[in-house]
Each structure stands twice: as C-alpha cells, then as structure tokens.
Amino acid sequence: MHNDLWQSYHPNGVPKQGEGLTRKDLTKDTIVAAAHVWLWRRSSDGGCDILLQRRADQVKNWPGYWDISAAGHVSFGETPLDAALREAQEEIGMTLDTSRVKFIGSLPKRKSAYSEFHFVYIYEYHGEPLDMVDGEAAALRWVPYDTFRQMIEQPEDVMLVPHQPLYFALLMEELGRISRES
C-alpha cells in the first residue's frame, strides 16, 4: 500500500522537491496530482471498448458511480507513471507493461479545498487477469466507445463520475482515433 503523503506540485506541473503533503495539509493554495489509467481493448467490430470501474459503496468520493479504470493520487517521491502502475495493481490487480502505457496529457483541476493535476494514460488490454483487489472497486464493466461517448454527455443519468469537458475531450479524441484505426 502506498504512503499517506502526496507529492506537492508547482503551478506549472513540476513536482516540488522534498515536499509531501497529508490530506490535512491541503489548502486552496496547494497542488497535488492524480494519475488516471483508462484501459481499452479492441472490440469485435474493430472499434474499442473502455473499462469502467464502479466505485464501492463505502468509498468517500462518488460511491456507486462508474469511473476511470484505475486512478489515484501521486504519492510523495513517485512519478505520475509510478502512481498509474501502482493504482492499476491495487485497484484492478493488473501489472501494466510500462512500454504499453501511453501518456495522453495532463490537465489542471481546481477543487474546493485544493488543486490537482490529472495525468491521463491509456493502456491497451490484451486479456490479462483483472481482480478488484483493494475494495475501492465494486464491479468492472467493458463499454463500447459509442456507448461511453453517450454516457459522458449525461454523466449523472448513468452514474458516471463527471469530469471536466476538456478532460473528456482529450480522452475521447485519443480513443476515437483508436476506434477509427480498425
């Protein structure tokens, strides 16, 4: 399990050397980061499916909602890629091959108590075993690209964790390119 210190960041997205923060240290002026990994697989029609995780009912944020395949905060001293690899292992029991993890971008997000950068990755799934390990996920579900595109238009209607429009635009541009490559 990762430590309770999160890596602190400068406003330009560069980590602050030697500065880790606990949840109680967070203020409106602090910036931390989260790594998001979206798993996708080639569908039978040549497009792509996206793996969603239903958050467990006992988690603090967005219980019962569908969300990113695996995600979590960047721990002190970790890189965003390290955090992505760790979270995939912790949440869905999958060891990612770093050569197949593709970084698609980072976006700032202002929260009510603090700010964070979201480092977004995609990963092509090839049938490796999946297992909801740490109790944060209650279910896993593969969703076709077109269905996911519809879900993000009305996230509350389908209990999908809402993200910024720019976030979904970044993700859907990359997944759309993959889906058209068939």
Q: At which residue positions do the language-model features occur?
A:
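Acidic, metal-coordinating catalytic segment for phosphate/diphosphate chemistry
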Residues: 1-44
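Nudix hydrolase/Nudix homology domain
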Residues: 64-66, 70, 76, 103-108, ...
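A short coil-to-beta-strand element that immediately follows conserved catalytic motifs
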Residues: 95-104
